[in-house]
Amino acid sequence: MRHARHARRQRGFTLIEIMVVVIIIGLLAAVVVPQFLGRVDDARVAKARQDIQAMETALTLFKLDNFRFPTTEQGLQALVQKPADPAIRNWRSGGYLKRLNKDPWGNDYQYVSPGAQGEFDLSSLGADGQPGGEGPDADIGNWTLGE
């Protein structure tokens, strides 16, 4: 009888053991998941900063060739396709960028020339897609890259 009871206990986990494991997994998830989500936001902000720096370089090359930045109306598209109005005489064959990417949150980058912060303002509106905000919702602009 003693041997039979011992063999039966060896066959599987008790409900209590399974509940303890589920609770431990839940506690670990409660600690790890928020830290992981914060890292995703940090990575998106870093990607937006890199995109803005690359577009800033392309805009500078555009100005070196054409003695001015694209107008607000021409926008960033002037870095990919030759603008027709006003005509650009020294537009680089192949353009200044291969394509325009959206920001890491799926929104268009904002471009204004002349800008309120400098010769041009180039920015992402952040996670919320609205001007202003804090944390991942904060705007990321070419004027904030040094921060």
Label the predicted regions.
Residues M1-F13:
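N-terminal leader/signal peptides at the extreme start of proteins
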Residues R2-H3, D42-V45, T57-T60, N66, ...:
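Short, surface-exposed interaction loops/tails
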Residues V22, R49, E56:
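Conserved catalytic core of two-component sensor histidine kinases
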Residues A30, G38, D42, L64:
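Short, conserved catalytic or interaction motifs in soluble domains
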Residues Q35-Q53:
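Aliphatic-rich helix starts adjacent to a transmembrane/signal segment
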Residues L59-R99:
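Short, glycine/small-hydrophobic-rich surface segments
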